[in-house]
Amino acid sequence: MAEITAALVKELREKTDAPMMECKKALTEAEGDLARAEEILRVKLGNKASKAAARVTAEGLIGLYISADAKQGAVIEVNCETDFVAKNDDFVAFVNKLAELVTTQKPADVAALSALPLGEGTVETTRTALVGKIGENISVRRFERIETANALASYVHGGKIGVLVEYAGAEEVGKDLAMHIAATKPRALNADGVPAADIAAERSVAEQKAAESGKPAEIVAKMVEGSVQKFLKEVTLLSQPFVKNDKQTVEQMLKEKSASINKFVLFVVGEGIEKKTSDFAAEVAAAAAGRA
């Protein structure tokens, strides 16, 4: 059997774009025969779209759509691998069409959306064709749809931050709320909506800091509670200073305008996705270690 060298693994990886360890396994199975290893990988990984699916999609675009009567709307995140593709006209059109489909067809989840008719096929076949055309993995990550008797407003910042707001009041209020949310990124409408885990984490940090002060227990308790309340004011929409007038909170602004907000959705591209950084030397070392 031919020796499975790092150079051979590198060559196969460049030919197939498969992960380093998959290349090593294929070469081992093929006993060092590069052509056979390539065929093994193609069977394993399928066509170009399947092959691309192994790659991390941390870039992308936020799509938004609101019906003409502003009663129905949707926000969607579709990911790709690079910011360059996120600006591709075909990719942008695909994302915007999906936002419209979510609004009008009301799919329950991403799987249901993928099965919807689009063009001469489905959303999924269109996505697969786009992967083949562009050469990058594309994945529909998430969406949220709102239908209301009140009104909807939206704001997209650079295609990377998208906000959908359900509110009651003047149209200007809806626009202001959407822009404020994009700028400040609140976690919830009010304190009741902040995840308990987030509050617990903040309390833990505050307790550690307060304990280091050396103050009496009752003072420490007040310091901790003060820190938690400060945190809640910073991350809840209604308690935040309004971006267009920081002398009043968002709640005060709404009261002044005789308006209200029922719900908001905030999507940030790639939020929570760990971006993969390529270190070929490290991958070669890992492959070599696995061979030893």
Swiss-Prot record:
Compartment(s) of residence: Cytoplasm
Chief subcellular location: cytoplasm
Entry keywords, A to Z: Cytoplasm, Elongation factor, Protein biosynthesis
GO MF terms, alphabetically ordered: translation elongation factor activity
The keyword Zinc is assigned to this record: no
Pfam families, sorted: EF_TS
Domain of life: Bacteria
Assigned GO CC terms: cytoplasm
Involved in Mg(2+) ion dislocation from EF-Tu: region residues: 82-85
Family of the protein in this entry: Belongs to the EF-Ts family.
The protein's role, per its UniProt record: Associates with the EF-Tu.GDP complex and induces the exchange of GDP to GTP. It remains bound to the aminoacyl-tRNA.EF-Tu.GTP complex up to the GTP hydrolysis stage on the ribosome.
Name of the protein described by the UniProt record: Elongation factor Ts
Lineage, highest ranks first: Bacteria, Pseudomonadati, Pseudomonadota, Betaproteobacteria, Burkholderiales
Gene name for this UniProt entry: tsf
